[in-house]
Amino acid sequence: MNTVTDETHAISVNQLRAFIERIERLEEEKKTISDDIKEVYAELKGSGFDSKAVRSIIRLRKKEEHERMEEEAIIQLYKDALGMS
């Protein structure tokens, strides 16, 4: 019975190690991708584009059209309320 427990423990440890190693590999890939994105933004800025505006466009493109429209309407409402229009 003790052998079964030891084998189960060994399997659990191996599985845990595999999960951790996968996460570590993915974190490294994420860092590499993040560095690549920073390089693209640097190129973008070097070409005369406004990186802040491009980030806003990218954020908006991730949203559904109805979400964008709702956000724009709320922003316009707030701007009107503050006399900014």
Swiss-Prot record:
Give the molecular function GO annotations: DNA binding
For this protein, the record's InterPro entries field holds: GapR-like, GapR-like_DNA-bd
The family database entries (Pfam families) matched by this protein are listed as:
GapR_DNA-bd
Alphabetical list of HAMAP family matching this protein: UPF0335
Q: Belongs to which family?
A: Belongs to the UPF0335 family.
The name of this protein is: UPF0335 protein BH15140
